[in-house]
Every structure is written in C-alpha cells, then in structure tokens.
C-alpha cells in the first residue's frame, strides 16, 4: 500500500523550525567589540558581514550522512554538504571555519540571533515557517521523505503504522517529524537528537519505524543497516528542497552565496559532488 503524498505547498506549510538534515560550521568569534570589528571590516570590502574576518563560519548537526558527518578515524567533517560548503568558500575567497556539532533544532535560532555562525548547511529543508526567522539561499538539492522499517516487519504501510501502540522515531525539529505528526496521528512520535539514534532504534526493535529524508535513509541502509528497508510505498513525495541558512540581517551574504551556487552548478562542480556522494546526479 502506498503512502499518502502531500503537495509540496501543503507539506511546507506544516513544517516548523528545524530540518533534516546537517551543515558545516567554522569556529566563530564571541559577541563583543572584537567581533563587531571583524564584521565591520568584512562588510567594507564584500557587502556582507562575517563573524570572523576572512572566514565563513558554519554550524551543523553532524549526524546526517551522507550530507554532514564526522569521520570516526580522522575526526574530519565530511559529506556532500561539507564539500558544497567548501566549494562555496573557495568561490567567495574565504577560509572554511567549522564549529562543533550542535542539536539540529538549535540551528535556526542560532543563525537568527547572530554572533556565532554565518551560515548553516546540512540537508535543511526550505519551509515557510523557517523563512519567517532566517533567510535561505536558492535551493541546491531536491529531496523527499521516507519511512524505514526492519525487514520482515508486520507493520510497513501508513495505515498499519498509524495505530495506537506504534512507536515512530524522528529527528527532532525536522520535516520528517512534521510529516509524521500530521500523517501518523494515532502513533506515538518519538523525537530524537539524530537520525542514527532513530535507525538504530528501529534496528533493535525499540521503534516500529522511523521517518527521515530519503537520501539519508537510502545511504545509511546501504552503509550500515542492511537489516532495515524502505518498504513498498515508503518513499514519500514531499517535494522538498535544501537551502543554506543565512541571517536576515545579512542579505549581501545570501546574494554572494547564491552567485557561488549558480557558478558551481554551471561549471559542473555540483554534478561531480552528487556523483561522488550519491553515485548519480539528483
């Protein structure tokens, strides 16, 4: 049985603050006279402010592979969005500056408040509610949602999962959480810190299913969760698009990043990165 699809317009209307999904970050100067000095000098030559002159500082939740994650062996941040961020930095002639991982649902408030990070990237869906708080760049990738269950599970359809006693894991603050709350109202929706916790919980039988971005769940099933699956009808066509989060107070930076993204698309860089991380263009 196929899952009910929502129109992109309807889906986006429901989504609250927080997304899918995970962005890179660079260390940021604290608020104060030295911070404002860096911002002023950055704006004088570029048309936008930076928390640290000459660097593009980013925050993200680094538990959302293949978009943003930390390499356990090297300790380096990596992923499709990390590579996109570094490519944008190169276009802007800025050095990357990545801050330690943060909770996903703190990203939008942090960028809105300012003073810590310039941008966030990490499979963050553009929604109307989020746009009330921060600005997004133009979209750089399309996405949908998905439901993941354990192979052999008796409950795999939306009707079966939308029942009392069913435990559905989601990452807190994401569009996956919004979709689950709207479409599985009879089930218990369990918000977690990251998608790895959600999928591991399904694997161990703690949860009946999880809902998350399709590119992420597909990647994780291939990499580490061979006993999980996206059941027939489990791909949910929500028509989402990812964008880079920027403060509303920094329109010049949004404009500069949009220009960089356009150049990365036209020169083939985006296609190359998609093939590197997804095996094909999306």
Regions found by a protein language model. Give the residues of each.
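A ligand-binding cleft/hinge motif common to bilobed small-molecule-binding domains
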Residues: 105, 124-132, 178-181, 203, ...
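Extended ligand-binding regions for polar small-molecule ligands
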Residues: 32, 82-91, 174, 241-282
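Bacterial lipoprotein signal-peptidase II cleavage site
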Residues: 28-41
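Acidic, polar ligand-binding/catalytic clefts
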Residues: 95-160
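Bilobed "Venus flytrap"/periplasmic-binding protein-like clamshell domains
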Residues: 58-60, 65, 77-90, 146-199, ...
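Periplasmic-binding protein-like
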Residues: 62, 142-149, 214, 218-261, ...
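N-terminal secretory signal peptides
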Residues: 1-10, 15-26
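Extracytoplasmic small-molecule ligand-binding "clamshell" domains
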Residues: 44-122
